[in-house]
Amino acid sequence: MKKICFGAGCLALGLSIAHADETAQWQRAIDAAAARGGGRVTIPAGRHLVGQLDLRSNVEIHLAEGAVLEGLPGLEHYRVVELPFSEGTWSAILFGLNVTNVAVTGTGEIFGNGTAWKIPEDYGGNQEGQRARGLFFADAKGIRLEGFTLRDAACWGIVFKRCADVTARRVTIDSHGNGNNDGFDIEAKDVQIEDCIVDAGDDCYCVKSNDPGFTVENVAVRRCVARSHSNGFKIGTATHGTVRNVRFESCRAEAPTRDFLDNRPSSPNFGRMHFYRPELAHLKVGGGLGAVSIENVDGGRVEGVRVDGLDVAGFMVPIFVRAGTRTGRACGTPPGSQYVFRDIEIANVRGVSESGYASSISGVTGCRVRDVRLRNVDVVCRGAGRARSEVAATRAVPDVSGKYPECNMFGGLLPAFGLWADKVDGLTLENVSFRLREGGEDVRPAVVLTPDVQVLPPWKDLAIRVTSTRDGSAQPGYLYVPPAAKDRKVPLLVALHSWSFGCEFTRSPGAFGLLESAKRGWAFYYPHFRGPNSRPEACGSDLAVQDIVDGIAYAKARANIDPDRIYLLGGSGGGHMALLMAGRHPEIWAGVVAGCPISDVGRWHAETSAMTNGNARYARMLEAVCGGAPRERPDEYRHRSPVTWLAAAKGVPIQIQTGIHDGHHGNSVPVGHAVRAFNCLAAAADRVSDATIAFMERTETVPSAERFVGTDPFYPAPVREIRLRRQSGNAQLTVFNAGHASNYEAGLWWLARQRRGAPVDWTLPTERDKADAGEIQELTR
């Protein structure tokens, strides 16, 4: 008798035939546990043959020491599922669809029996849907995987599609049993993968996006090992939607321990699909392609990627970053999509490049890479030898924009042995070394940056300290002065950090402001103004206001700043401060852009106090700033609110932007804040009524009579379609299809047309004006 234990009870299950198909019995046990409200189903030691087992909410599958859950070969043992949001068919040994609070734990093993599954003769038509995955989750939430081993899956190993709240710890995947042997395939949000080992024939940790309607975000892979014949830590290849805030931290990339396939004579796949790469012949069983591969080739949105701490050996190159158009369509053209590829930082990487190929960072015409930072990178390169490197040194790199992205996609070696970059806007190299191994031979330079690469200085080289004229303290910030400032007056862009950060948070809008200022030959100032809005000296205080004024004076003293072209830009907390500065110091600004701003901190205290999803913390921050709630300290709240001061800013050109969905779905600043700020600046006849504001905040729509009619290429429909636009005097309000968002690209284009003292320029942009689509910032407060 075998015992299946769950909850406080235990269910006895009898099996009369050793090693028979146990699928039905185990499925009954899982269903029984679910019917009792959930609990644990324990798979005891021994071999258990199963087809597909459907997981249930609140049920944990526990693999005891010595337990082997072995997948039966052949699709007839699996319930093949088609999903409306994903092409192809899906099956798995453990299948979790629309489940919540599920777990797979223990020290036992799931054996995919991959070598027993037949694959088509033509690898190009590998028919992934005809082979079962190891574990598959879709539209699931609250997934916990811990301790077990997955061996030789027939296809991908562990798959998350449109999932949320995922944790995997101390999981081992050893999978070389068939084609497409990925380790983790991640299309999910709020994911933590820690202390795992993947030894696989295909990509090990693969973050991707197939569904444009689902945002893949907040993914962290920490202290993990990747051993691969393909890519170690990857974003892509599928990038149809949004992927953002992905971190690979303190990881290792190593050579795999087995051939591309098991390749035993007893295997039905013997001799097939064994990829032999001459470049890696010196490794025992070959090696991988890119240790880190970050790709955007389907016209989607990839941003906020961090690699911090990576030891590399056994891969052709350590770093591969690629924008492309593998489907042959222009970037951002699929319905509802908007191409963005930016904000990538790769830091503290050391190791070996095992081939003559170079690491690369490259885009294509119309699809460029923006804001890439390499810091503390030390790579020893194998080199290609004299003869091959002499040819490669003068070789023209072909256009391979539609080709499948891999580090060796360029039809031959690149003109550098260490790093090659092309079509990059904003590349920063800080303490970066690519050097030949001892005895290595290669005539190519270590690093080649084509003329189509914009190089930026490291942030540390821009750091300044500005002495406050109010309290004498030294306030941090960053100042960029372009070379052109030696010969002529240049504009100054001042960008303001968001609510919960200081100037150390250089992602948004700091990185955007620096990059765009450098492109235009402008000066750029990024002040701290007393840091996060959680202390009395921050959050619109007199000290914070004066810090910005002092910083501008500091810039003027060190650069030839045009006083009629000083611009201000900020979003969220930065939008709050931008409006406050417009009202308190209107004499400075040629133009101000405020995205998703907080305009009345007293009102916002009441709103966030009633919010969930953690937004109530903003009310607590305001109480810490003001010394109590609004009823206790009304003067403090009024003093720090832009609506108190904006009447003085009617002579300043001001553009206010916000998303119609802000204040909903976890977003924290209701749309009424932007609208009421506009009303402070507008003539009475142009103001938005209180009834319309209430309707917008309640329904996330605009009354039909108020809807914007027209087009603006900076707000493409439907993904960023304008819902309402009002202009009055020097002020413009744009409410568009977004959450807590600012459109800095639109704002900066408009700012560049403004001059202090001149009439405001409301010229509508054209498609030609919009050179780079989609610098819309989804903000972190």
Each predicted region: which residue ranges?
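Short substrate-entry loop that stabilizes the transition state in hydrolases
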Residues: 486-490, 495-537, 601-602, 664-666
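Active-site-adjacent alpha-helix of alpha/beta-hydrolase-fold enzymes
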Residues: 626-628, 660-728
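Mobile cap/lid helix-loop segments that gate and shape the active-site cleft of serine hydrolases
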Residues: 500, 504-509, 590-591, 597-598, ...
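Alpha/beta-hydrolase active-site loop
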Residues: 539-559
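Short beta-strand/loop motif that positions the catalytic acidic residue
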Residues: 656-658
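Primarily recognizes the serine-hydrolase "nucleophile elbow" in alpha/beta-hydrolase
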Residues: 501, 556-558, 564-613
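Extracellular/periplasmic carbohydrate-active domains that bind, remodel
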Residues: 18-455
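N-terminal cap/lid segment of alpha/beta-hydrolase-fold proteins
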Residues: 456-486
